[in-house]
């Protein structure tokens, strides 16, 4: 499940899967040169690059010398995607390698909502099933997100929503029937849908994804047409550690930026007294924009932008 399993070894990096050190040399501008290690297992290269960029965050790029890699199919596919044999970290992480299926695309038409008096791009259909999957070497877990299912997730979701810690911030406690109805409303919404976050395919969290323009937050800031927003909760106590929260918070931000390349910003509007969450947001790339009032709560608006996320934060 861990793929190449790149680890630190002495003064370099070692691939446990290949059972040998990686032949890495220093390049220009904080890049490294990765020499061809020989015959590779299927899917090794992209997984290895992902783990190299995590293990050596100072690297801006990895060079795969054409003369050495020109007969390696995995490298040729990657060269075609980035149009170079220099794999820049920020560009690599913006490839759709971790999307479980091709993202739905909108028609490009514009829609006017007369009730709210907003003009925005028509949204694509809601995705189905699993949407994202990536092994996180920091915590040695497979992170994935899938669309919530009112049938299979209802009992678990009800338990989460009736947890006093969750209920305090969400104010959404209630019976099984109440929670099924809530999920079904989310699944029929035109601008939002619920995801279940999983570690090693075990459900851990609920994340509501929405288009900011059509959501209530759209009345409180100058939105861009493809801004995405999210509401978050961790349902299982054993997965509330900071390292796990960083994994799925960065992961869901990554998913949103891959899902729609025109999305430049992602936003949250947690309650101002949710201090535990605020401790996790800045390391994941979210900066405070302002505080403001909803009818039911005082909120802090935080925002991550694409350039900062991929160049300064990463995965």
Curated annotation (Swiss-Prot):
Gene3D superfamilies: 3.40.630.30. Pfam families: Acetyltransf_8 (PF13523). InterPro entries: Acyl_CoA_acyltransferase (IPR016181), Acyltransferase_MbtK/IucB-like (IPR019432). It catalyses: N(6)-hydroxy-L-lysine + acetyl-CoA = N(6)-acetyl-N(6)-hydroxy-L-lysine + CoA. It is found in: Cytoplasm; Cell membrane. Pathway: Siderophore biosynthesis; aerobactin biosynthesis. Optimum temperature is 40 degrees Celsius. Its EC number is 2.3.1.102. The keyword Transferase applies. Belongs to the IucB family. This is N(6)-hydroxylysine O-acetyltransferase.
């Amino acid at each position: 499940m861990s793929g190449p399993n790149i680890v630190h070894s002495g003064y370099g990096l070692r691939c446990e899967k290949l059972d040998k050190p990686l032949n890495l040399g220093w390049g220009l501008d904080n890049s490294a040169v990765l020499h061809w290690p020989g015959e590779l297992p299927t899917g090794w290269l992209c997984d290895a690059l992902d783990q190299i960029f995590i293990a050596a965050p100072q690297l801006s790029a990895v060079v795969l010398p054409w003369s050495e890699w020109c007969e390696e199919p995995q490298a040729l596919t990657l060269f075609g995607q980035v149009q170079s044999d220099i794999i820049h970290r920020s560009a690599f992480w913006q490839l759709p390698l971790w999307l479980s299926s091709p993202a739905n695309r909108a028609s490009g038409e514009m829609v006017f909502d007369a009730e709210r008096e907003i003009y925005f791009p028509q949204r694509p259909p809601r995705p189905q099933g699993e949407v994202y999957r990536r092994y996180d070497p920091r915590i040695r877990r497979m992170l994935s997100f899938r669309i919530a299912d009112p049938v299979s997730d209802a009992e678990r979701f009800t338990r989460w929503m009736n947890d006093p810690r969750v209920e305090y911030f969400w104010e959404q406690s209630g019976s099984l029937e109440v929670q099924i109805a809530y999920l079904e409303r989310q699944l029929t919404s035109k601008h939002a849908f619920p995801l279940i976050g999983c570690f090693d395919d075990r459900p851990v969290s609920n994340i509501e994804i929405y288009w900011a323009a059509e959501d209530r937050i759209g009345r409180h800031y100058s939105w861009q047409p493809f801004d995405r927003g999210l509401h978050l909760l961790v349902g299982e106590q054993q997965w509330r550690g900071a390292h796990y929260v960083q994994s799925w918070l960065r992961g869901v931000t990554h998913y949103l930026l891959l899902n729609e390349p025109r999305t430049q910003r992602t936003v949250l509007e947690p309650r101002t007294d949710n201090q535990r969450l605020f401790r996790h947001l800045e390391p994941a790339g979210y900066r405070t924009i302002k505080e403001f009032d909803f009818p039911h709560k005082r909120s802090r608006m935080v925002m991550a932008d694409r350039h900062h996320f991929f160049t300064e934060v990463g995965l």
